[in-house]
Structure formats: C-alpha cells, structure tokens
C-alpha cells in the first residue's frame, strides 16, 4: 500500500511538472512571436540588417496589427503591409522581402539586406538607388505600425537574442 502511494505521488508530481513545462513553453513561444518587433528593436545586430522589419512581416499573424487609416494587412499567402494612400507594399514571401512602389520594386534577403532592384517602366533609373534611403523611406511609411508595437510585461529579450542573434550578425 505504501509503495502504491509513492508511485501515485511520483506520477502526480511528474504529470504536474510536464503540464507546467508545456504551459511555460507555450507562453514563451507566444511571447516571442507577439513581442518580436519590440525584441528585434532592442537586439544588437550587424549594420545593414533590419531585424525589426523582418519580424514585422514574418510574424504578422502573431503581432499587434493596429487599425490605422491607410494601412491594410494581407496575410493571404505571403504576408504584406499595404499603404493604400500611396500604393506602397512591403511584403514577405518564402523568407525574402520586397518593397513595391509605383513601377519600382526592391528585393531584400532574409536579414533585409538589399538583394535586387527592378524598374518595370523599362527606362534607365534617373539616379542611383541607395539602400539606406530606401530603408529610411520604408521606416517612414510603416512607422505607425512599428511604433504601435507593445512592450512585453514579461521580458524574454535574452531568449529572443539567443534564438535570432546568429541570423542578424
């Protein structure tokens, strides 16, 4: 009888431990996704990479997407944020990112480094394309979405850094 009680106690303690572990794991996963833009803004990263813009698009289904006049979110297929006033589109498809503006498209790699530029008018570009200027424009256009991202109540910055540090360095 005593052995039976010990076995039941061990099973109960083990079961509670598993449930607590699973609960904490789900919470940590959800926290890292929902607050990913905030964490990415705080994370040290190599110059030229843009972790906050990457997280904005990669985790669009999990982050806070405020209702902002002139901004539309499209997660049908690849993720995209659309400035409907100016018809600018920032999108993510299969780990790469694009910024579309009029007859002009800029492609970025998985860390948001400039990959290619396409001009669909067939004309020669009137001036050289500067990566920093394009990124600054993207930040200005989509700043309302980035600025609206909340700060986490329980900060798991260390865990976010551990997961993404290598990608952005």
Please place each PLM-identified region on the residue numbering.
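Polar/charged alpha-helical tracts
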Residues: 4-8, 27-37, 41-42, 54-58, ...
């Amino acid at each position: 009888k005593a052995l039976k009680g010990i076995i039941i106690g061990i099973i109960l303690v083990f079961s509670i431990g598993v449930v607590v572990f699973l609960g904490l794991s789900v919470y940590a996963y959800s926290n890292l996704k929902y607050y990913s833009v905030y964490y990415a803004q705080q994370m040290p990263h190599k110059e030229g990479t843009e972790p906050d813009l990457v997280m904005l698009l990669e985790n669009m289904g999990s982050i806070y997407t405020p209702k902002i006049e002139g901004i539309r979110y499209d997660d049908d297929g690849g993720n995209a944020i659309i400035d409907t006033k100016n018809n600018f589109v920032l999108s993510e498809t299969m780990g790469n990112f694009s910024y579309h503006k009029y007859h002009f498209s800029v492609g970025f790699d998985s860390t948001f480094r400039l990959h290619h530029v396409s001009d669909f008018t067939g004309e020669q570009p009137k001036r050289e394309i500067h990566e920093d200027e394009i990124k600054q424009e993207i930040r200005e256009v989509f700043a309302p979405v980035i600025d609206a991202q909340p700060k986490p109540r329980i900060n798991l910055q260390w865990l976010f850094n551990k997961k993404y540090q290598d990608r952005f360095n």
